[in-house]
Amino acid sequence: MANAEIGVIGGSGFYSFLEDVSEVQVDTPYGPPSDSLFLGELAGRQVAFLPRHGRSHKVPPHKINYRANLWALRSMGVRQVLGPCAVGGLRAEYGPGTLLVPDQLVDRTKSRTQTFFDGEPLPDGTVPNVVHTTFADPYCPVGRSVALAAARGRGWEPVDGGTMVVVEGPRFSTRAESQWHAAMGWSVVGMTGHPEAVLARELGLCYTSMALVTDLDAGAETGEGVSHTEVLRVFGENVGRLREVLFDAVADLPATESRDCLCTHAHDGWDLGIELP
């Protein structure tokens, strides 16, 4: 089976920028991922792309099989993941078209399975141990630096750091919820950043979020109610720039064998009880 070293999880239009694309269906112990993986070459690197919501956006945020998605990527050889996503801005200065590379995350989801290490037997009879993963810094520091440099190189000055609060969805926040998020000092709000980030960490993957602001959330000073139509419009206007940044980030990520960041040491000293792919 073909392998990749870098994974991109994003909207279904992104795989169109890969060269020599092949579509691969992957089975996992956690069921099927959101869709097939699209393997190809980008910037001289072997990349696996996975449409987070499936083709045609058929899977809502709270129904995404995040465990299967990350497991499938790792089973294909992926060790570094870029996760572009659409978010709402919680500050007036983070208007539509802002690119923010967060360094912190707050989980406000309710029903999502967020660990591989729950002590529940897998289909092959193996049983993962209960593991408490270090997650103080949820994003790869190396990947963040690469993403920031890639954006600046394309003339798109990104916001360096900030907190993404992740809500359950699929509805948008009420005004009261959004005002509370803003009052807490959080930067942007999204629906898919968790448990994607922590599951990547549990698998020893370097994960970098690249958050494109598509609207001012209702709790921002000048924010109105969010509409899905407006989110799609703004994302469509900026997807070309985001592809360019992704291209450069993929080119500049370190070689897999040279990784030595906190992500690679997440389970030092732990007996996982299962073998990772």
Give the predicted meaning of each segment:
Residues R79-Q80, S187, C206:
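Short acidic/polar active-site loop segments enriched in Thr and Asp
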Residues R74-G77, A182, R201:
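Non-catalytic positions within long, well-ordered alpha-helices that form the structural scaffold/packing
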Residues D137-A182:
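Active-site rim beta-loop-alpha module in soluble metabolic enzymes
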Residues M1-F135:
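Metabolite-binding pocket within alpha/beta catalytic cores that recognizes anionic/polar moieties
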Residues M191-T229:
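Zn-dependent metallopeptidase/amidohydrolase metal-coordination segment
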Residues H267-P277:
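Acidic, Ser/Thr-rich low-complexity intrinsically disordered segments
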Residues A218-D268:
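His/Asp/Glu-rich mid-to-C-terminal helical/loop segments that flank catalytic regions of hydrolases
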